[in-house]
UniProtKB/Swiss-Prot annotation:
InterPro entries: Ankyrin_rpt, Ankyrin_rpt-contain_sf. It comes from Mus musculus (Mouse). Residues 616-626 have a biased composition (Polar residues). This is Ankyrin repeat domain-containing protein 55. Residues 354-377, 455-491, 522-626 are annotated as: Disordered.
Amino acid sequence: MRQATMDFSTSSVFDQHKGDSSEEVDLAMVYQAASNGDVNSLTSVIREDPSILECCDSEGCTPLMHAVSGRQVDTVKLLLKMGANINTQDAYGRTSLCLATYLGWLEGCVSLLRNGAKHNIPDKNGRLPLHAATAEPDVRLLIVLLQQSSLSEINHQDTEGMTPLHWAAFHNRPQHTQMLLKKGADPTLVDKDFKTALHWAVQSGNRILCSIILSHRQGPSIINYDDESGKTCVHIAAASGFGDIINDLAKVPECNLQALDVDDRTPLHWAAASGKAECVQSLLDLGMDSNLRDINESTPLAYALYCGHTACVRLLSREGRAEPARPLPSQNSQPQKKEGRFSMLNQIFCKNKKEEQKAHQKDQSRARPKEEETSEVNDIIATFDSVVDTNCQGQPGDQVDMVVFKKRTSENSKYLLPEKKSLARKGLPPIRTQSLPPITLGGHFLTASQGAVSHAGLNAGPQHTAQRSQKSRSEQDLLNNRTGCPVSLENPWKGDTRQVFSCKAWTVSSSDKLLDRLFAGQPGHQELSGPPHLPHLHNPSSGQALQHLSPNRPKIRDLPFTRNSLAPLPDQKFLSGEPLRTNRVLPAIPSQRGHDPSPAGESQRGHDPPRAEESGGSSSPTHDEN
């Protein structure tokens, strides 16, 4: 009997794996040949198996898309002639025309359009090739697409509410903006953050771009539009240090230079807190009232003093000698929420919360009989004095004047100054606090920390952190240097609200004494103390600005750009070196609304470098066209 032996002659499995391997090699060869323009090899392979024309790689790209990525116009024409589908979409929803537009390949776009490519197919971000064309410096590509586009496509909004006009202003493209407006683009449309194209133009710092939008027949009507945080174009220009743009905006009769944001801060408050002396001077020359107070009862001079901006203090002190500015309320006796490295700025812009006192006051008011109204009002006065200042001690015992900030519900009323109303005997009304808006300080836009909203219910309600829109959150997520910071500071939005630290803030003294100390080179406030990882304020020497923090403070991360990258395939190998880069960092002012932030929404908008690289700093874009 023969011994059983293994028969290696049966090679069906081997042949099957060999066939699969050769098929993979063939596809790789096809993609490589398409990218390199190897027409002969590509033709021979496709003739053997025409179905290869519709084969897709892991990113959903066909050989035609690879030919577009390699800018091989002859290969594109050959593949189309052999029957390739010109409107196939990849894994990101992009067609071959969309890819060619992202790459700024004018010749390829013309060839695809002549062969029947559709220009109205949006990708998964809702963007048309028209959106992508705004990132290309050559305006001819946009002109070619505009010739094929309808008015609805010109005003098409992507998933972030951005129209091609928004993107043109975002990319600082005056010629593109002019062409879009000429073809019927609507400048009154707002994105999800209620920003118009004029907001983006002002943040770019380009006077020519701003003048193009303002010269449109609808331009003056949007000059007072405020975004979701209540900031108008003048606020943005003041915070960014664009004094020349402020002067241009002021020439429009409809411009309101004293518009109030959600924290009742004027552009002068922002310019003073940011240390923009040129903007402070421009606003004062334009007749801006330097004695207006925000929700914290602080004037622009108080912010300039606290931040140590000597030049701004000199300008504002000459204007406000008639009514001295009161220093910020002392916060020595109350615990403060841990805010990471931004705690110093939160002392400037966040209202000190007195929830323990209010809860105690509520319990006392409920326990007392209704006949003791006079005693209840006295408690309210005492609490109000400890929260705001000592200015109300001279008020009559039966009422206290409080500032009631009305909700801005119409275009005519949202810019009115706060009205004074007497307090009814119903207890202390809730103190509205907002999250810290970032200010341009020391060449960086500092990300805002969130403040808690105080509620006047029976119990001290839970703190609700402000929700930022997806677009506003992305303005803080795409950081270039996400490492190198202490663990406790990696995500200041998720800090433990129960963790507190003691701090020493301003000593209550008159504004004149503070001015004398500042000009005499003496320290104007006490040193801010906190945990070792927090920044410290040191006593300023003569002529030094208080904005300089401790040399041992953590390095402030460069602010990322705010918008989703228009690069079509940021991770695809065959587009290495080719992805389109957005190149402006917007001086972002995040949302301050009191909603719960969604961690799932902290998605990145792209992987592009900050646009501040071309703008000369992370705080403001450049004047490319100046």
